[in-house]
Amino acid sequence: MPFIPHSPEEVREMLSVIGVQSIEDLFVDIPAEMRPRSFELPLGLSEMQVLAKMEEMAARNRTDVVSFLGGGFYSHHIPAAVDALVSRGEFYTAYTPYQPEASQGTLQAIFEYQTAVCRLLDMDCANASVYDGGSAIFEAMMMAVRATKRRKLVIDEAVSPIWRTMLASYTSNLSLDLVTVPQVDGRSDMAAMKAAVDTGCAAVVVQNPNFFGVVEDFTDLFAHAKSQKAASVISVYPVMQSVLKTPGEMGADIAVAEGQSLGQPLSFGGPYLGIMTCTKDMVRQMPGRIVGRTNDTEGRTGYVLTLQAREQHIRRAKATSNICSNQALCALRTLVHLCLLGPEGLIRTAELSMERARYAMERLTAIAGVRPLNTAPFGNEFAVRLPIPAFEAVDRLTARGYVPGFPVGRYYAGMDDVLLVACTEKNSFEQVGILAEMLGGIL
């Protein structure tokens, strides 16, 4: 529908009908000193001028760099078929499937997505997703609070600081007791977390691999939490789950993930995907939409939104969350991506990423003054200490077309010299070699 402004005659007619003389009369309730005297808007531009302006702004983005950035968001290859299939109109423009008789295709796609992520994480149930990895952790924490009727939450400092900042914002007015257990050289302090998880604890929250890329086994911690009747929440990197011990094998009650690495392109601000799974015992605390499969009176398979009494369109303030829009299109991208790769393809993606990361660790730590932050096992990401501030290394190499990683000191005190380096299947061995040569040249 085109935007056609009202003519002056139409404006006068509308003002006359409502009994005012001018548009300004509509704002008389706003004190004059609070009204802007002028918006100082520039004159309008032609279509060609607007296009040129947008291209000028877009050119400020660097798209020609080789990146080793990670920290929870990774540049994996996305098959072209993902965009081709997801952009079909029946998916791209579909609305929330409240009417199952008219939405079987959308509902089945969500059901298949739920099935896929449950198999990947070895959990019982999944929802249709939430906004992103950070909101998924928050919703998991609130599930635990509702289930246990407790207010204390223990969170590992090695959980992404980006997500922990989100949690602080989400919970600022909820009267929750967030206890952060300090990490030790990028590793989880298991003993300290066990000590913090007591009979007053609602949940313990961890990440695997953690923000520093370290792979941990939380089986004992989760068993201890269960003995205290506290829930176990784990955030995972879904690509690495194809080769690591699953949340289900560790005994997690709730497993969540940032789903960006499965079919979502890197984008500042998203949209991304919050994967949420849990055990059967926790499913009624799950927020968002859940699709179930059943048979109708004629024996035909049908898909419906199930357990809807949890949702805000049924219970309003008493719902498990106020999520009203979901990331179903992003969830579909993840489903298509997983189906195109298959189990072997996903495992191969993880293996290639890990091979390159191990080669990068060998090459970088061979440089004088560079040493690993710890000796723990890692997946496709690791942290090293440099003889200069990591910010300086990032700035100098980025200017030359290589982003060497993420400066950890941005979020962790005392780690200004720590660089977080991530590799995916898109980073070649040649690129890793060039990175090592460039880094060695400035140290």
UniProtKB/Swiss-Prot annotation:
Biological processes, Gene Ontology terms: glycine decarboxylation via glycine cleavage system; nucleoside metabolic process
Subunit relationships: The glycine cleavage system is composed of four proteins: P, T, L and H. In this organism, the P 'protein' is a heterodimer of two subunits.
Protein name (Swiss-Prot/TrEMBL): Probable glycine dehydrogenase (decarboxylating) subunit 1
PANTHER family cross-referenced by the UniProt entry: GLYCINE CLEAVAGE SYSTEM P-PROTEIN, GLYCINE DEHYDROGENASE (DECARBOXYLATING)
EC nos: 1.4.4.2
Record field: catalytic activity: N(6)-[(R)-lipoyl]-L-lysyl-[glycine-cleavage complex H protein] + glycine + H(+) = N(6)-[(R)-S(8)-aminomethyldihydrolipoyl]-L-lysyl-[glycine-cleavage complex H protein] + CO2
UniProt similarity note: Belongs to the GcvP family. N-terminal subunit subfamily.
Gene name of the record: gcvPA
Alphabetical list of HAMAP family matching this protein: GcvPA (MF_00712)
Function (record text): The glycine cleavage system catalyzes the degradation of glycine. The P protein binds the alpha-amino group of glycine through its pyridoxal phosphate cofactor; CO(2) is released and the remaining methylamine moiety is then transferred to the lipoamide cofactor of the H protein.
GO molecular function annotation: glycine dehydrogenase (decarboxylating) activity
Transmembrane regions listed in the UniProt entry: none
Keywords: Oxidoreductase
Keyword Disulfide bond: no
Highest classification ranks of the organism: Bacteria, Pseudomonadati, Thermodesulfobacteriota, Desulfovibrionia, Desulfovibrionales
Enzyme class (EC, first level): oxidoreductase
Record organism: Nitratidesulfovibrio vulgaris (strain DSM 19637 / Miyazaki F) (Desulfovibrio vulgaris)
Family annotation (Gene3D superfamilies): Aspartate Aminotransferase, domain 1, Type I PLP-dependent aspartate aminotransferase-like (Major domain)
